[in-house]
Amino acid sequence: MLSTSPSRSFKNKFRAAFWPVHNYELGKFIPISALMFCILFNQNILRILKDSILISEISAEIAGFAKVYCVTPVAALFVIIYAKMINHLTFEKIFYYLSAFFISCFILFAFVIYPNIHIFHVHPDTLSDWMNKYPHFKWYISLVGNWGYIVYYSLAELWPNIFYVLLFWQFTNELTTTEEAKRFYTLFSLFGNSSLILVGFLMMNLSSEDTIIKKFISISDSKITLVQVSTTIIAIVAIICCLLVRFISKYIFTNPLFYHKTKSSRSTAQRMGLIKSFKYIVKSKYLWLLLICSAAFGFAINLVEAVWKAKIKELYPTVNTYAEFNSLYILWTGVAIIVMTIIGNNVMRMHNWFVAAVISPVIIMVTGVLFFGLIVFDQQILSLFDGAILMSPLALAVSIGGIQNILAKGTKYSIWDTSREMLYIPLDDELKTKGKAAVDVISAKVGKSSSGLVQSIIFTLVPNATFTSISPILMVVFTFVCFAWIYAVRKIYFEYQKIA
């Protein structure tokens, strides 16, 4: 009887822990990882730009109104359009058409609307007069008067949920088995989210006063140049995404070594009509629990981010300085995601799904309460540690908020995202496609828009309110939502065990 040598045993254990991908699987693993890298690369450039433009050009308070009254209706419309498209078009064509639409809109804003914003927007003095005359409606007036910024922000907000959460993961879930997912998904997260570090360094340079762009072109307005150069990069990377989708569709879906499902199973979801498919989804307790989890994250993180971003604007008031700080934050978020992905990979293998999935809501709740505590009890804390804190209260709030967001996003984009995607794998094709579209696109926006709705109601009723003044209320709501998220994770774990 042959015995396994100690060196071979150690090699197998090392591979299982750090590189559980077989050599013959690299033909599938590398293209999917590259696609995730490119989609997240664009996603994080857009994240930096949308916040820097909207908050610096208008205010932090307007973001909540934009999410409620602009982003959510567009997201709902997209789900309806997508359900129609999937019945008539291949995934490949859907990806091409949506990419062309979004990139065209971003180019139009960067090269036509933004440089000539005074032509397209209501004059600031006129807008200010209207807002002063109707104080309870001033934020709604600002939405309409600054429509260019709002449209750009809305489309940039939709990019992650359409291209990453929906299209990429639907594509990937179709290609991978449950057994492969346990080995691949955390590594996808590791390689894909490393793009945040590259984006951080890139955007820090593009937004700084000593940007490398000055060596090649003359800069008349640094903020417009920042947006135009960034948009050009986004367009190039989007083309690479389309080429990767083409390669995967042509060479991986047709290779029985990489793709193990029958063509008939892939087309099952396309035979049901729109109304019938949505009725099917509504009856699924499983999807409702998934919706609560996704919505809870969007709701909770948006409450913290809203207050934090208002503080950032006070410290960094211009588009470029805001973008430079945001780039540093994105960079460290990338580092946190990579570290937590390595941790999460081992947690998921060594423990059950619930242990891995519950890490995100617990960390977000603990760090969020600490941040709100600093904002609500700032004077008491500063007097208690008088002389020990070497930075201003504003700089301290921005720093603590940054740490909170880095830890929250780090756990969410590494551990929670991969845990959530495993929940879709055992589902049938209808729930896996149209059900995923409804949950992933709508739920995240419902979460953020519900949070924005709470904020918009307060700001409408109390026109002079600020995020600092309403922080005690937001803190209570935030804590309640985090507990609801933890409860939903526990319930869906029991449902997952029944079908996995």
UniProtKB/Swiss-Prot annotation:
Q: Which residues cross the membrane?
A: 26-46, 62-82, 94-114, 149-169, 184-204, 224-244, 287-307, 328-348, 357-377, 381-401, 469-489
Please report any disulfide bonds recorded for this protein chain, giving both cysteine positions: none
Q: Does the keyword Metal-binding apply?
A: no
* Keyword DNA damage part of the UniProt annotation: no
Q: What keywords are annotated for this sequence in UniProt?
A: ATP-binding, Cell membrane, Membrane, Nucleotide-binding, Transmembrane, Transmembrane helix, Transport
The places in or outside the cell where this protein is found are: Cell membrane
Q: Per the record, GO CC terms?
A: plasma membrane
Q: What is the recorded membrane topology of this protein?
A: Multi-pass membrane protein
Q: Which GO terms describe its biological process?
A: nucleobase-containing compound transport
MF-aspect GO terms: ATP binding; ATP:ADP antiporter activity
* NCBIfam families documented for this protein: AAA (TIGR00769)
Q: What does this protein do?
A: Provides the rickettsial cell with host ATP in exchange for rickettsial ADP. This is an obligate exchange system. This energy acquiring activity is an important component of rickettsial parasitism.
For this entry, the protein name equals: ADP,ATP carrier protein 5
Q: What organism is recorded for this protein?
A: Rickettsia prowazekii (strain Madrid E)
